[in-house]
Regions:
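Pro/Thr/Ser/Gly-rich low-complexity, intrinsically disordered linker/stalk tracts
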Residues: 27-59, 113-127
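Beta-strand-rich modules
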Residues: 10-26, 93-113
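Recognizes extended acidic, P/S/T-rich segments that occur
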Residues: 1-12, 65-98
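GGW-centered surface loops in extracellular recognition modules
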Residues: 127-189, 193-196, 269
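Short aromatic-cysteine micro-motif
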Residues: 181, 208-334
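Short beta-strand/loop motifs in extracellular/secreted proteins, especially
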Residues: 60-65, 102
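Ser/Thr- and Asn-enriched, surface-exposed coil loops between beta-strands
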Residues: 3-5, 46-53, 60, 80-84, ...
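C-terminal, surface-exposed recognition/capping segments
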Residues: 275-278, 300-311, 317-318, 325, ...
């Protein structure tokens, strides 16, 4: 196999379709190969609190525009080669709004340079810490009690559209869609979570903030790096996982193969895992203040349809109809339209070490549960985001606690979550096991990109 540096063929940024064919003297040319879509843009990374580094610069881009939350802050000259780097000093930037984290992006500018934009990098919070929390996570009533700065906040559903006091609050106001290398991904900013538990390690309360919080008794504060969450269910093309609109979700693939297809995209990619899944789950609980996801939206009780069904919604969260396709914070099918495999749990153990995914682990352990109503999530203070099933209630009506079904057992089992049935035990916190090699016509996955 011969590799080729695509920079010498590619226009300055943008997207191009590349194909190839074999030629040899005395032989007929081969047919063209499959088409590969190559997308190029500048890359942005944080060097330290005062410096950002632009890589994959282009000679044709004589300058780079620097944006903070979409507002032009600076234009920095570039006179280097294709593939070069450029450091940007942001120490002198001023900001017009306190109480916000700023997402920095850059664009290359120059004659013949196609439209482009880097990934977003978040920089420090300006203003006082704002803490949004809920308690009551180990009570039989599904409703939660708002705490800290979330007291008095609310949300409403009208004509299948959600209006929420959290739309303007961190981190929800920064959960926007970005197009990165052809994928549609939702940005989750760097944040802190305060996670509380009782003497048995069962989850009792959770809070989110942009700055570190003080941990009280039986509480732990954890820092979460920024990451991207797939805006759509996973699709697979050419042995690689994508998050794209206008294509069918991929089913009938094992958890292990989904893992392989995600990693084929690069070292920073992975399929949905327990660690990142719980970050989103906790943010959902804080916004809606209920363990009963059905009380917010049910999601489509099937596994059909094309990705992008909710693209015409003009708000971050809503549904096409009661019980129809839904999205939350621009994440389509966050509940419903099929189950989704997630990594990080195997048999009766869990880990956040990606190198251990798909094998027996014991960083966090839990007991078998034979198909009942989930009553509690259990945490370990060393791994507080690996919230695993911690209790159950024999309640076939599923009208207490989390109101979702849980089944977990020892051996070579992997796990999925979500909804594709219309039963009351389906929902956001459903936890069900599969043989590791199993596939299903209603179980897919989702792409993550870490930073």
């Amino acid at each position: 196999m011969q590799g080729k540096d695509l920079l010498q063929f590619h226009m300055p940024y943008g997207q191009i379709q590349i194909t190839s064919k074999a030629k040899a003297e005395g032989y007929t040319d081969s047919d063209f190969s499959n088409v590969v879509v190559y997308d190029s843009h500048p890359h942005l990374a944080k060097v330290d609190s005062n410096t950002l580094r632009i890589s994959n610069c282009r000679a044709a881009a004589t300058s780079y525009e620097v944006y903070a939350n979409g507002v032009l802050k600076d234009t920095v000259a570039y006179s280097g080669e294709d593939g070069g780097t450029l450091d940007v000093d942001i120490s002198g930037y001023t900001y017009s709004q306190d109480g916000a984290i700023y997402n920095i992006t850059v664009k290359g500018i120059g004659t013949g340079v196609a439209e482009n934009e880097s990934e977003a990098v978040s920089i420090g919070w300006k203003g006082n810490n704002i803490i949004l929390g809920v308690s009551g996570l180990y009570q039989s009533a599904p409703a939660l009690t708002r705490t800290d700065d979330a007291v008095g906040k609310t949300w409403t559903m009208s004509n299948n559209v959600i209006s929420s006091d959290f739309d303007s609050l961190f981190p929800y106001n920064l959960m926007k869609r970005h197009t990165i290398d052809g994928d549609e991904l939702v940005f989750i900013p760097e944040l802190y979570l305060r996670i509380g538990h009782n003497a048995d390690g069962l989850l009792t309360d959770v809070a989110v903030a942009p700055l570190e919080m003080t941990a009280g008794e039986n509480q732990v504060v954890v820092h979460v790096d920024a990451f991207y969450f797939g805006a759509y269910g996973a699709s697979v093309l050419g042995g690689k996982m994508y998050s794209k609109t206008g294509v069918a979700r991929q089913y009938n693939v094992s958890c292990g193969n989904f893992r392989t297809y995600a990693k084929a995209r690069g070292a920073k990619y992975r399929q949905l895992d327990l660690y990142h899944m719980r970050v989103l789950d906790f943010l959902w609980l804080i916004e809606f203040a209920t363990k009963d996801s059905d009380a917010v939206m049910r999601g489509y009780t099937s596994s059909g349809g094309i990705c992008g069904a909710t693209d015409n919604l003009t708000v971050p969260s809503g549904q096409l109809s009661n019980g129809g396709r839904m999205r939350w914070r621009y994440i389509e099918d966050f509940i419903g339209n099929g189950l989704e495999f997630f990594d990080g749990a195997y048999g009766l153990g869990a880990t956040q070490d990606e190198s251990k995914y798909g094998q027996a682990v014991s960083d966090v352990t839990y007991n078998p549960i034979d198909g009942y109503c989930l009553s509690a999530l259990k945490i370990n203070e060393k791994y507080p985001l690996l919230a695993v099933p911690g209790g159950y209630e024999r309640n076939n009506s599923y009208n207490t606690y989390f109101r979702d079904y849980v089944h977990c057992g020892g051996g070579g089992y992997v796990y999925c979550r979500g909804r594709y049935y219309s039963s009351p035990g389906d929902g956001l916190f459903r936890w069900d096991d599969y043989d590791a090699s199993s596939t299903s016509s209603n179980t897919g996955s989702r792409l993550l990109l870490t930073l």
